[in-house]
Amino acid sequence: NTGKVNPEHKNVVTYQKDVEQILTDTESSYMVIPQGDMLLVSIPKNENMQQIKSGKVILLPKKTGTDNQLALKVKSVTDAGNGMLQIIGETPDISEVYQKVDIQKEKQADMSMFVPNEDVVASVSNLNSGLKGASIQATVSAENGKIVELKEQKLGTVGTFSGSVELSAPKVTAIVDADFSKRLHPVYREVSVSLNEDITAKAELKFSSKGVGSEKIYVGHVSTYLGDGLYADVVCYLNVSADGKATIQYKLANTLTASYINGDFRINEDSNGSWEGTKAEVNGQLLGEPQLNLRFFGYWFDEKLYGSIDIVGVQADIGPKLKATATVHDTEPKLCTNLDLYGYASIGVNTDFGIGKWLKNHTRITLTKVILDNNTANPLRGKWHYEDGKRTEGDKCTYQNKKDKENSILRKIIG
């Protein structure tokens, strides 16, 4: 297997024998309230509730109209009166819920479920064919893409930036093949995740004074229910930094894949990028940072996720970096600027939870990889030459050419 879904694969999910699946009269008839590290569930009593006891792991059904679903390790059960039970519990370990998991899923995210970060997002609209400067409309319809306009943000302590991000609907592939029969010794045969998405971003950077500023902003997320209790969260960040004043724009068609298969860990990334209208007086970068977290269960509450059993998290820093050097001359052209622009891509696995944490603790495998950098092997690399604000033909330096000719004439005269 190479991390690709087999359409003929039969998914198998086996729970531990002591796990109790709780049925409710109506799926939406329970409430969840976070209490520190615990969750409080208020649920109507019925004959299915007799098995809910301290120490028991229970599975609650998916709530109607949402993708919220919980697994809970019960700490206490209280009769609250009025026909209601109050259950306080914590998130169980994956080995306390599942005995065997062998599932392969592939699904495109529904961007109508995109949840923006209202602190930084001014507006969200549908992506359509009328957009200027965007070249992904041929494959992206209004139903599955979003344009996110950002509020003006502070960039470090030296200035501000504003801009926009175009997000197509990402396609997620997930494969989990694991055995938790021996709870203290889990066997991971394969954990693979793949994220395919297009990003077009533009940032306007305005500085009140020269200096260095940087900002990482959380733009928003979209959750996709893959089935069998398995979810994928695609989270979008932008990393913006600059020294001086810059306008940065790029488009990226990107696929990132992380696979752990029978003791072998692989990271793959396929990027096709382009930049239009990019200019800079000094240095800057605009990196899209898509993150893909694969999890079982979870409950979104006030833009926070509770009760999730995380399997794997993959994040990438992808986008353009640019360097500029300026030289002032005493004759025309007065100012020569060399602009060095290159695509950068790195991908890594989150080692705080799930398979990433397990690999960190049990292997010496490198879990971060730089795919593209500023070297000759990078196809997304270019150099531009400007003189007094205008790009020269063939990016040649006319000042240097004049100097070479003058020196040649001088040598002939002297010689």
Feature annotation, model-predicted:
Residues S42-N48, I88-E96, I199, L205-K206:
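Secondary-structure transition/turn motif
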Residues E143-N401:
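Membrane-lipid interaction segments
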